[in-house]
Each structure stands twice: as C-alpha cells, then as structure tokens.
C-alpha cells in the first residue's frame, strides 16, 4: 500500500510543509504539499489523495472549513483527514472532530507519532474500501 498512497499536506508555514513532506516521503508515500486550504481543495478535486494532513489556522480559509467542504463533497467525503495543529485546547479538538476529522495531532509533533497515526488511518481506510 505504501508507495501508492498520496498524502495531501496542508499548512501555510513552508517549514512545516518541508518537514512533514520529508518525513512521509522517507516512508514511501507520495506527498503533495499545499500552502492554503483553497489550493488544497482544488488539488483534492483534481486528484483525490489517500489521506489529508490538515492544519487549522490558515489565512483565507481555515482547516475546519476546508474539512467541512470536503465532507460535503460526494467525491471527497471518504478521504481520511488528520488535523495537525498548535491548538491544543479540548474545544479546538472537538471542533475538528465535529468538522469531520478522524484524528488530531498537536504541534510540536513527534515524527514516530505522525507516522504511526498516518499508517493506521491509511490501513483502516484501505480495509473499509
């Protein structure tokens, strides 16, 4: 399954995109970075990814709104979304789950945790489809 999976990473901080991309590419995933939610939605519609790693606080459109739009789209609603954010308040996490996220990782993150969560959700999604 790895190597064939495409992970869309959405974060407005270029350094976060570089770090997450390098981490996931090392494990054989094809990574597609997006600097904004608007660009990420266009990329997802053009070529639906296997999984989305999504920041919350971004200009233009935040990650919660992007997730709501994904879940409202018949063609994209089944894509697993993992939020990855510096917001660590319980209410922020609940809002992310209510928007349609399946998991939530707080920044600063640990590489092994990100890889474990991504791997688990890809396996679950693969078995459900």
Please state what every model-predicted region is.
Residues 2-6, 13-32, 38, 42, ...:
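Two-component/phosphorelay signaling modules centered on CheY-like receiver
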Residues 47-53:
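Active-site beta3 strand of CheY-like receiver
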Residues 58, 96:
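Receiver (REC) domain active-site loop signature in two-component systems and cognate sites
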Residues 59, 77, 89, 107:
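The feature encodes the CheY-like receiver
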Residues 109-122:
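C-terminal output helix
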């Amino acid at each position: 399954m790895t190597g064939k999976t495409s992970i869309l990473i959405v974060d407005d901080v270029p350094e976060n995109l570089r770090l997450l991309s390098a981490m996931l590419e090392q494990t054989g995933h094809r990574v597609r970075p997006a600097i904004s939610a608007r660009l990420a939605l266009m990329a997802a519609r053009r070529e639906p990814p296997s999984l989305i790693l999504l920041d919350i606080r971004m200009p233009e459109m935040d990650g919660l709104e992007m997730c709501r739009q994904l879940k409202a789209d018949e063609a994209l609603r089944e894509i697993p979304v993992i939020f990855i954010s510096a917001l660590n308040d319980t209410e922020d996490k609940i809002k992310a789950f209510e928007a349609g996220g399946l998991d939530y990782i707080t920044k600063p993150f640990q590489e092994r945790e990100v890889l474990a969560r991504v791997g688990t959700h890809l396996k679950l999604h693969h078995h459900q489809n």
